[in-house]
Amino acid sequence: MGETAIIPLFYHQDIEINKKVIKACYDGGARVFEFTNRGIQAHHLFSELKRWASEEMDDLILGVGSIVDAGTAALFIQEGADFVVSPIVNVEMAKVCNRRKIAWIPGCATLSEINFAEELGAEIVKLFPAAQIGGPDFIKSVLGPNHWSSLMPSGGVLPEQENLEKWFKAGAYCVGLGSKLIIKNKNGDYDYEKIRTLTKDTINFARDIKSQVE
């Protein structure tokens, strides 16, 4: 996650649209992708996507996001999730992921939550909603006493050099990007070529910025 520095996240009820979006991001250089758990049949879609990705792009790390309970985490792990992202800190979810040695990325909004999540085994912590809880300045404040923390802001991050500079210069480990990266054309259809090029440009921006601050 730190290598490409961005994590695209997406969900659609149409399996083919999911595949095209994932492929566009992959072709743009993304090697980690978060499928968000937003629909009733999301786990069935994920299962098919995982099998497809294993055959078509075997170096893609495909995980699941928007998980809020241990049972759902276990279900997606059984379907092959490489990591689990949550908007909350949940002790039972941490136990499930740790038992299966699956990376668990909980969502936190305070320094106390971040420390608690790390005590539960979280190597990376999601800051959510990042813009609303203080943005880049919040990251700077956290990394003062917690210089070892790996923070992934999500919510309010833009695939633009100026915006990315603020997050990474503040100390972000990586960033989550959704609808601002996975964009549509004027007709309302997903613009897969634009998604590919925007992913490529965003990764290049992020890597350049991180190389300057590390």
Features from the language model and the residues they span:
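Alpha-helical segments flanking ligand/cofactor-binding loops in enzyme cores
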Residues: 19-23, 74, 95, 115-118, ...
